[in-house]
Regions:
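Alpha-helical transmembrane segments and immediately membrane-proximal extracytoplasmic
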Residues: 1-196
Length: 196
């Protein structure tokens, strides 16, 4: 499939146009993943803390619930995922520097589940890192699926990062600046336009 798409692309559009075209599904999927992370974490939090506020041991549950969230995250990683989720933004930076931008496919969904459980049960972590990691993993995997070169994969990582941050903070300029500052090695108009 990737060969057919690449063959069609080479005959019908330039590389810049193709990257601009890829910005739509990459941005949509990365933004959607950030919304899913946020909504799922808030749903879990609202559900369990609503139960906790109606319990006689109200204060004790606020210590127990985060431990349950961490335990569920460990169980998911150990028995279902059977590997470490990764290290968020540093993991993406490592993939850019050492793996030609290749992020493992499981990173597109693992942080959605683990961060939603941890934060939803009251763990003291934020949703920004997992959102950036998931959005970047989506961009990387789209690039790998289409067998793009490292430069274009890094641009797709930047697209995913910017879209995820823009979605979770509802601040698109912040997402763009963060993606350029943290992930983009080569800043040119050809790589900047699709991120915007």
């Amino acid at each position: 499939m990737a060969q057919k798409i690449n063959k069609w692309r080479h005959t019908h559009m330039s590389e810049k146009q193709f990257m601009l075209l890829l910005s739509v599904p990459t941005g949509f999927l990365a933004g959607l993943s950030a919304i899913i992370i946020k909504k799922l974490a808030h749903y879990i939090r609202d559900y369990f803390y609503n139960i906790a506020t109606h319990d006689d041991h109200y204060g004790l549950l606020f210590f127990i619930l985060p431990a349950i969230g961490i335990l569920l995250t460990i169980i998911f990683c150990r028995y279902f995922l059977k590997r470490d989720v990764g290290h968020g933004i540093p993991g993406i930076l490592y993939a850019i520097q050492k793996n030609k931008g290749a992020v493992k496919p499981y990173n597109t969904f693992a942080s959605i589940i683990t961060s939603s459980l941890t934060v939803g049960f009251g763990g003291s972590v934020g949703l920004e890192g997992p959102s950036v990691s998931t959005g970047s993993a989506i961009g990387s995997n789209i690039g790998q699926l289409l067998r793009l070169n490292q430069k274009n994969i890094v641009v797709l990582i930047g697209m995913g990062c910017a879209a995820a941050l823009a979605s979770i903070f509802q601040a698109p300029i912040t997402g763009i600046i963060f993606a350029i500052e943290v992930f983009m090695i080569d800043i040119s108009m050809a790589s900047l336009i699709p991120i915007i």
